[in-house]
Amino acid sequence: MKQALLLSSSSYKDTGYLRHCKNWIYEFLKECGVWDEQVLFIPYAGVRRTNDEYEQKVIDCLEYKNIASIHKFSDPKRAVAEAKAICIGGGNTFALLYYLYKFDLVEAIKQRVEAGVPYFGWSAGANVAGSTMMTTNDMPIIMPKSFDALNIFPHQINPHFISGKIAGHNGESREERLEEFLIVNQKSLIYALPEGTALRIKGENATVMGMENSPVLKMAYQEETELIKVGESFKF
């Protein structure tokens, strides 16, 4: 059965890096029966830090030592093939997907997750778990081979969702940007995840998790946005 934890963000308000979701990750690993197994960490989204720095930051902040970054393996595909759990950190989604394709890991990760290997990721790591990365919030700093992503969750994900316009900003709101996507891709569904929320995937079912009662938004072309409250589940 497919097992995934897709986190909107690495931080929530002033709680610190991965602090708000640390227990969620612990519970996820225990529930999936891999608490004592090594987690394969994929740091490719972390453009502004080295792979070593990113790995150490995650180990320190999660207070979980059994993490090994994929950049330390001589054969990345084999590392994925042998992984007992897979984690992808946040950063720049364009860079992340570029390297996943460069090392031929997209299909490899898909196959492992379909086979029941637990997957968790935050921000860019949640975005690429969707059908494509086309609802990312990130700068296109490098061009991946394709926008097609891991399709663990077969719809679009927009992490870090914030409603409305920031004071002094005269560009489009997040809702307007996502509406643009739906105008061009009318059969797609978008699930917008506010800060501090997550989707817990079990098979073909998802449950909304959250620090507060911040609902996940389900958006479809020319339809009223549906609010899915924390604790509610849905089939996809």
PLM segments and residue spans:
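Catalytic nucleophile loop
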Residues: 87-90, 113-132
